[in-house]
A protein has these predicted regions:
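P-loop (Walker A) phosphate-binding loop of NTP-binding proteins
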Residues: 29
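The conserved 3'-phosphoadenosine-5'-phosphosulfate
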Residues: 200-278, 282, 299-309
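Membrane-proximal basic amphipathic "stem/tether" segments
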Residues: 1-18, 297-356
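Lumenal/extracellular "mature" regions of secretory-pathway glycan-modifying transferases
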Residues: 169-187
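A conserved segment at the C-terminal end of the G1
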Residues: 35-47
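A structural motif corresponding to the C-terminal end of an alpha-helix
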Residues: 118-121, 194-206, 276, 283, ...
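PAPS-dependent sulfation machinery
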Residues: 48-129, 134-135, 170-174
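Conserved phosphate-donor/acceptor-positioning beta-strand/loop module used by diverse small-molecule
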Residues: 130-131, 141-166
Length: 356
């Protein structure tokens, strides 16, 4: 598929309210359906089509420091132009260079400049963003992009746990390898809990959507999201256009073959033993119930052994500490560039943009 596709909504502008032009952030814990919902919005038309996560706040803003400093902006652009993140925009450096150097003062400015340039090139007036980790940066995002609308997609934490455990995305500490399946469960609780606290402070600019509702009752769910963002999310059109993961589900269980999104619901029941289900539900049961899910393990049986209780206490502190290190220490300036699609050897005055 080409990086930039023709947007069929181009040329059909009408008088629109400020909210109907506002950027939309589709956020959630990893493996919760953020990409699926993001591609659903893009398939509806009227949004800039960008087949990548921007990683603006969780990587670019941390790595390149204070963008009010001209030299930091220059360094950001020089490295950004060599990255897959930029290649997938379909832009040329001339499309953003002057405006970034003259007008950009923070990460929000940079993201808006890039996404608005994509939108202009495609003839639309709106953009969306779907980096899952941006859920942890909601207060900053809302500060620097005040008109941002946030759709927090929440999926059953047990299915998220099964998916994250399958791909080994979150590694346990060495002494917890025997209970590695619990680490993504605790991460889900930590991430979704923070996202909900941050989101509810945004008032009418924040909405929560369940992945299961989007998959099992798409018309009504899309109608609700459409009212929130003031955008026509026509289900039939979305199915016809079917960009990205709307057409090809992003499953971590590749051995299952091409399956529908609906087939991913409740997979944890087949993957975990009753003992593992008990431990997972003892770790995240309260948040599962708060977000509308039913538990399998009776309350009287949800008692965890001491090692599990220690994990429930220590891992959130560990996750908080990692975020603090990246946000408030020089560690971010030497962060791995792989999320940008840059190899260390690619950066330099002779670096060339990727053309494949």
């Amino acid at each position: 598929m080409e990086n930039v596709v023709e947007n069929q909504a181009a040329g059909h502008e009408a008088a629109l309210s400020a909210r109907s032009r506002a950027p939309v952030f589709v956020l959630g814990c990893g493996r919760s359906g953020t990409k699926f919902l993001y591609h659903t919005l893009l398939s509806a038309g009227g949004f800039a089509v960008y087949h990548a996560e921007s990683n603006a706040f969780n990587l670019l803003g941390l790595r390149f420091g204070n963008l009010a400093i001209s030299s930091n902006r220059r360094q950001l652009l020089d490295e950004y132009y060599t990255s897959k993140l930029f290649h997938r925009t379909g832009l040329d450096p001339i499309d953003i260079d002057k405006r970034v150097m003259e007008d950009c003062r923070n990460t929000g400015d940079f993201l808006r400049i890039v996404m608005e340039a994509i939108a202009r090139k495609q003839g639309v007036n709106r953009w969306a963003e779907s980096t899952p980790l941006h859920l942890l940066f909601l207060p900053l995002i809302k500060k620097v992009i005040p008109d941002a609308l946030v759709v927090h997609i929440i999926r059953d934490g047990r299915d998220v746990t099964a998916s994250l455990h399958r791909i080994g995305w979150i590694r346990p500490l060495p002494w917890d390898r025997a209970r590695a399946f619990l680490v993504p469960a605790i991460y889900w609780r930590w991430t979704v809990g923070k996202g909900r606290r941050y989101g509810r402070a945004l008032g009418s600019d924040y909405i929560e959507v369940h992945y299961e509702d989007l998959v099992q009752n798409p018309r009504d769910t899309l109608a609700s999201i459409g009212r929130f963002i003031e955008h026509d999310l026509d289900y039939d059109r979305i199915q016809q256009v079917a960009l990205g993961s709307v057409h090809n589900p992003n499953s971590s269980f590749r051995g299952d073959g091409k399956e529908t999104e609906a087939a991913t619901i409740g997979r944890w029941k087949r993957m975990f033993t009753p003992q593992q289900v008990r431990d997972v539900e003892s770790s995240i049961g309260s948040l599962l119930v708060d977000t509308g899910y039913t538990l399998e393990t009776p309350l009287t049986e949800r008692h965890s052994p001491l090692p599990v209780r220690l994990m429930n206490f220590l891992y959130p502190l560990y996750f908080d500490f990692k975020i603090w290190l990246k946000s408030y220490t020089p560690l971010a300036r030497i962060a791995d560039k792989r999320r940008m699609g840059i190899a260390e050897s690619d950066v330099g005055p002779d670096a060339k943009s990727e053309t494949k």
